[in-house]
Amino acid sequence: MSEIKDVIVQGLWKNNSALVQLLGMCPLLAVTSTATNALGLGLATTLVLTLTNLTISTLRRWTPTEIRIPIYVMIIASVVSAVQMLINAYAFGLYQSLGIFIPLIVTNCIVVGRAEAFAAKKGPALSALDGFAIGMGATGAMFVLGAMREIIGNGTLFDGADALLGNWAKVLRVEIFHTDSPFLLAMLPPGAFIGLGLMLAGKYLIDEKMKKRRAKTVVNEIPAGETGKV
C-alpha cells in the first residue's frame, strides 16, 4: 500500500513531469491556450501513458535489451495512433484544435522516460498506475496553465468544451468578464512561459511551507528533555 501511495504522490506532485522534471514543454506551452485544449491533450497523454506502461511492463521479459528503445517507440506509436483515431471519431473539433500535437505524443519525453525508468522494471499493475499518475499530474498542470491563460486572455473558462465532451458541455462555458479584444500576450507563447514560471514559483513556495510545517511537527514531537542532547 505504501508503494502504491508513493507512486501516486510522486506522479501527481513530488515528481510532476511538467513542474519538476520540465518534460513535454512543447505541447505544454503550445496547446494550453484554452482549458479545453489543455484538458483534451492531457487526457490523451494520460491514456497513452497508462496503456504503454502496461504493455511495455507486460512484455519486458521478452524485450531484448539491445533494441528495447525502438520497441518502446513502436508500442507508443501504435497506442498513439489508436488514440488519435478515437479522438478523430468522437471529438473531431478537439482533433482539429490539437492538430499535429496528438501524433507528437510519440516523441514526448514523458512517455519514453516512464517506459525506460519505470515500466521496464516494475509489474504491469504498478506500471499502469504510474502512467496514470504521471499523466494526471501533467494534465493538472496543463489544465491550470490553460485555464489561467484563457481567463486572462479571453475572460472565459471552458470555451469550446463541447468539442471535447459533446453538445451538452456548452453549458460549462463561463464568461468571467467581457472583453472586445483578447489579451494577446496571455494567448501567445510568451504568456505560456510567464504562466509556467508563476506555477513553478507557486509550487516551490508550497513545498517550502510544507517542509517548514513538517519540521515544526518533528520538533514538537521530541520530548523536552531530549532537545538539548547532541
UniProtKB/Swiss-Prot annotation:
Membrane topology per record: Multi-pass membrane protein
Superkingdom of origin: Bacteria
A matching Pfam family: Rnf-Nqr
One GO BP annotation of this record: electron transport chain
Keywords for this protein: Cell inner membrane, Cell membrane, Electron transport, Membrane, Translocase, Transmembrane, Transmembrane helix, Transport
The EC number(s) this enzyme carries: 7.-.-.-
Primary localization class, coarse: membrane
Signal peptide: none
Transmembrane segments: 18-38, 39-59, 63-83, 86-106, 128-148, 182-202
Subcellular location: Cell inner membrane
GO terms under cellular component: plasma membrane
NCBIfam families to which the protein is assigned, alphabetical: PRK12405.1, rnfE
Function: Part of a membrane-bound complex that couples electron transfer with translocation of ions across the membrane. Required to maintain the reduced state of SoxR.
Homology family: Belongs to the NqrDE/RnfAE family.
Subunit (UniProt): The complex is composed of six subunits: RsxA, RsxB, RsxC, RsxD, RsxE and RsxG.
Name by which UniProt lists this protein: Ion-translocating oxidoreductase complex subunit E
Species name: Escherichia fergusonii (strain ATCC 35469 / DSM 13698 / CCUG 18766 / IAM 14443 / JCM 21226 / LMG 7866 / NBRC 102419 / NCTC 12128 / CDC 0568-73)
